[in-house]
Amino acid sequence: MKPYRDYYFLKAKHEKYPARSIYKLKEIDNRFCLFQKGMSVLDLGASPGSWSLGAAEKVGKTGRVVSCDIQTITIPLPSNVSFFQEDIFHRSDSFNNILIKEGPFHVIMSDMAPQTTGVKITDHSRSLELCLEALAIAKCYLLQQGSFIVKIFMGADTIELVKEMRQHFERVTSFKPCSSRTKSKEIFYVGLGFKRFTTS
């Protein structure tokens, strides 16, 4: 195991987070200043729960986090986090109603990743599909001037995601956190200044 993997794994364990991904979110927020007290956040692909915990800390008791994943979350969650076990491609009517009731959200974030095959083209294609679905949800439930975070496995069609995001955000920036593994193909795109009433 490489030293940097040891560091973030042990740091997460020591600070009682379920995964090292918490530090990716912290780095993203340090760079872009996305969260404030009292905000509402939607966390897509939330399991095992690190991003929901991180967002809950940032928005405080007056804020709220709605999180969902096809897999369950087993860790205790604070009172300002509501978790729903949902497939975002086949959302139940009850969950859609919750999104309508709780939204629009100040921040929508997706750390979703597909089941990897080891075939880069396949993994990239599946990752892009998740990203575009997350963006479709953001277009429905993100607040005017809100922010969007999405992870993708890099590949030839990443530009498709970027082009789509640029139609709906004033600024779109790529970011690779230091806490990402050096050889990882993952990169995050951050959309700032959502233009809610843009048509495409």
From Swiss-Prot:
UniProt EC number: 2.1.1.166
Q: Does the keyword Transferase apply?
A: yes
Q: Which UniProt keywords apply?
A: Cytoplasm, Methyltransferase, rRNA processing, S-adenosyl-L-methionine, Transferase
The positions annotated for binding S-adenosyl-L-methionine are 49, 51, 69, 87, 111
Q: Which InterPro entries match?
A: RNA_methyltr_RlmE (IPR050082), RNA_MeTrfase_FtsJ_dom (IPR002877), rRNA-MeTfrase_E (IPR015507), SAM-dependent_MTases_sf (IPR029063)
Q: What functional role does this protein have?
A: Specifically methylates the uridine in position 2552 of 23S rRNA at the 2'-O position of the ribose in the fully assembled 50S ribosomal subunit.
Q: Which family does it belong to?
A: Belongs to the class I-like SAM-binding methyltransferase superfamily. RNA methyltransferase RlmE family.
Protein name per its UniProtKB record:
Ribosomal RNA large subunit methyltransferase E
Q: What is the lineage of its organism?
A: Bacteria, Pseudomonadati, Thermodesulfobacteriota, Desulfovibrionia, Desulfovibrionales
